[in-house]
Amino acid sequence: MVTTNVVTGKVVVVSGPAVDCEFPEGQIPPVHTAIRIISEGFDIPTPIDIICEVQQHIGEGRVRTIALQPTEGLVRGMQAISLGHPVEVPVGPETLGRVLNVIGEPVDEMGPVNAKKHYPIHRPAPSFEDQSTRLEMFETGIKVIDLIEPYLRGGKIGLFGGAGVGKTVIIQELINNLAMKHGGVSVFAGVGERTREGNDLWLEFQESGVIDPHDYTKSKCALIYGQMTEPPGARLRVGLTGLTVAEYFRDEEHQDVLLFIDNIFRFTQAGSEVSALLGRMPSAVGYQPNLATEMGELQERITSTKNGSITSVQAIYVPADDYTDPAPATAFAHLDATTNLSRDIAALGIYPAVDPLASTSRILDPHIVGEDHYATAQMVKGTLQRYKDLQDIIAILGIDELSDEDKLTVARARKVQKFLSQPFHVAEQFTGFKGKYVKLADSIKGFREIVEGKHDGVPEQAFYMQGTIEDVLEKAEAMKKA
């Protein structure tokens, strides 16, 4: 029974992030209700004021909650106040340029977020009649993505890769390109990743002008963090907080929003920890039995409506590079495009280290992207696939044993491979190359000319870390003079 009055109970069991609270019978708060626990009347060095979320009703007036903030210093008998609604977070333009935590509190020491509206983090997905079925490509300015696995506006994109192959750098470049070229709003949800990365991202965005913490009208991105040091409850719910902030811009301001989740695997990992704390029987590989349901509740809210869209780019860590692991495999089912990052390509020094043969897109279709784009992408993939097939022969017999036609294919494939590299704006200080945004038409033109043999006389090295084909020809001229 839900009452409108404030219901007060007390803490009866504390076992790490799982906290059991007792309430009067008949006034038990429903599942997903926010519970505030305070240390008023207790003589402890640091006062406690934390938020938990109801997960289970365990009988005799008791509920099991999961803490969204650290539980150090929590003592049995402390006051537990039911807030009567789920966790609510500030939404609106006032969140831009700010760093918020899972419960919407600012963690950037820039004062309170004076938002006019608050939304609950648990909300239903848009209904069938509200959803849009329009298929339209979203230009990113990154050659390999735009040509081989074009992103769908309002779609879900997975960035797959093991540790350290460049998922976060691609996300940073996408935010930069969206803000600089499209003037759009982004929401970045840092789910269980390194605190240092979160801090670096915030500082980089200030330097590049993506955000101004002192003036939200000049900011293009809201940052929502639940980092590795946070309790599992925070890491499980911070994705929903980020999504709720993005939903405001889609539904109320009718914008096309980019939602970045780094890393969706940590969301699953946190769910597994919470599941164990709640005493559920583990499923395959020790994951939670409700893995697909949890993932669905998050993913189904990320969609296009007739008012606006949320295009989501999700970094997906692949444990031990095993794509059959239940966590990445469950995420696969929801995606419209996949950008697959390969350690082998990174080892060649080609960045972004995207594997063009393993990456896919639902909209790489001549009816959606056009005949020219589709044909060029297939020619590029065909050339790279032939090169891959010939690599065993080259390794055993050497390149001289190939036919003239195959030698030409290999030469063009190596140029294509080098041309797939691209200098990023956000990596300028590491690479020394000036960042380049490449329009789709320039990408198609450049790759088509390479596979058709127009640049067979240009040295391979001239194609490395360049933007357009004109940049390549300029580099080749400079190499000749040197």
From Swiss-Prot:
An annotated Gene Ontology molecular function: ATP binding
Membrane topology: Peripheral membrane protein
Family as reported in the entry's similarity comment: Belongs to the ATPase alpha/beta chains family.
A Pfam family of this chain: ATP-synt_ab
Binding site for ATP: 161-168
Keywords, alphabetical: ATP synthesis, ATP-binding, Cell inner membrane, Cell membrane, CF(1), Hydrogen ion transport, Ion transport, Membrane, Nucleotide-binding, Translocase, Transport
Enzyme Commission number(s): 7.1.2.2
Location relative to the cell: Cell inner membrane
Database matches in PROSITE patterns: ATPASE_ALPHA_BETA
SMART domains the record matches: AAA
Function: Produces ATP from ADP in the presence of a proton gradient across the membrane. The catalytic sites are hosted primarily by the beta subunits.
Gene3D superfamilies cross-referenced by the UniProt entry: 2.40.10.170, Bovine Mitochondrial F1-atpase, Atp Synthase Beta Chain, Chain D, domain 3, P-loop containing nucleotide triphosphate hydrolases
Stated name of the protein: ATP synthase subunit beta
Catalyzed chemical reaction(s): ATP + H2O + 4 H(+)(in) = ADP + phosphate + 5 H(+)(out)
Transmembrane segments: none
GO cellular component terms given for this protein: plasma membrane; proton-transporting ATP synthase complex
Matches recorded under InterPro entries: AAA+_ATPase, ATP-synt_VA_C, ATP_synth_F1_bsu, ATPase_a/bsu_AS, ATPase_alpha/beta_chains, ATPase_F1/V1/A1_a/bsu_N, ATPase_F1/V1/A1_a/bsu_N_sf, ATPase_F1/V1/A1_a/bsu_nucl-bd
